[in-house]
Amino acid sequence: MPPGSWWLVLWLPPLATLPAGAVPQEEAAMSVPRCKSLKETDLIKTSVSDCYCYNQHSQIEWTYMWSTVQVTVTSPGLLSIVYITGRHTCQHTETILSFLKCVTHNFWTAEEAKEVTIVFSPYGETVCFSVKPVGSLLTYAVSVNRNVVDFRLFLVFATGIFLFFYAKTLSQSPVFYYSSGTVLGILMTLVFVLLMTKKHIPKYSTFGALMIGCWFASVYVLCQLMENLKWLWCGNRIYVLGYVLVVGLCSFSACYSRGPPADEGSRDLLMWALRFLSLVLVYTGMAISQFAYAVMILLLLSWTRHYLLRAFSCLRWKVRQWFATRALVVRYLTDDEYREQAEAETASALEELRQACCRPDFPSWLAVSRLQAPKKFAEFVLGASHLSPEEVSTHEKQYGLGGAFLEEQLFSLQTESLPAS
């Protein structure tokens, strides 16, 4: 594999995965034959610890691009969910990206709760899980609902589209810089502090390792807070508001002291980061991965269309130069050039006529018999001018400057330009 292409391992294998219901998912489902099959709008109430499987749809429909399946397990007492097959077991993952997603999900999944909600795509792999009540067996309910349009999923997709097309504008906006910095400081304090202290870290490798650790830690804390958001807001509202106010002011002060990026390199880096984030949001905001890949490719093509058009126009211009014949360039003569060429061509033609008349085979008697002025023709053959002084004077009076022909042309143009009465 050439250097710099290692990231393809994370993305190319999902393109070749089999659709839901293919051999890998069927084998996984057959490994737990006693599990009950779940369908949409199912409502199961039982007090027996059992396992359940939801078989994914094999036929893809474009109307369900933002649909999700929600399985809710509720009980008066504590219960736990154990995944048997699927992406949450981390045993049959084919790519590094799938393994990281599996480990991350299992890392912040709540182990014990009275209500557990599982949300997944209806076009993924088969999901099997078992419900194990903690302590004494109590009656619990398993309900399955399908959201045709999950507005949270659609909101993530729309946000990705907006970020992609307005990444350059947002990277140059001071308002976006201060607002995004404040929000980042509130939601991901560790990442914000690391970015503020970047200049004090000499090695990029150390900074990269710290960034990965701070990012995963911030995501874990954020997911834990989102799961307990209702409890935090009801019981600790004052502390939540105090944290948001204090950390928000500190984050805004830090961003204000540093100021928005002034150099072009920092702005370009922020623009590329926003566009990469937009592609991630587009991918995570669609339930069908094939459609997500198609939208991402269309976005990249729309972004690079002016580069492609410019390259195509340059190629077409080169090909036209190679194969097309050069067009003739026509230049019009000036009055002086026209007069000079006319005099030269006339003198050359008259000289050719003299030479032709001096040839032995020239029928001189026949020519003399047809001429009105044979003496003038003989003088012309011997070297005299072909025009007499009287003819030259008459021509100048008729066609020269101030002549009758020129005056007639001028007066006729003026008459045509006058409006009709």
Curated annotation (Swiss-Prot):
Membrane-related topology note: Multi-pass membrane protein
Pfam families (UniProt xref): NEMP
Protein localization: Nucleus inner membrane
TM segment ranges: 147-167, 175-195, 206-226, 232-252, 279-299
Signal sequence segment: 1-22
InterPro entries: NEMP_fam
GO cellular component: nuclear envelope; nuclear inner membrane
Keywords: Membrane, Nucleus, Signal, Transmembrane, Transmembrane helix
Family to which the UniProt record says this protein belongs: Belongs to the NEMP family.
Name of the protein: Nuclear envelope integral membrane protein 2
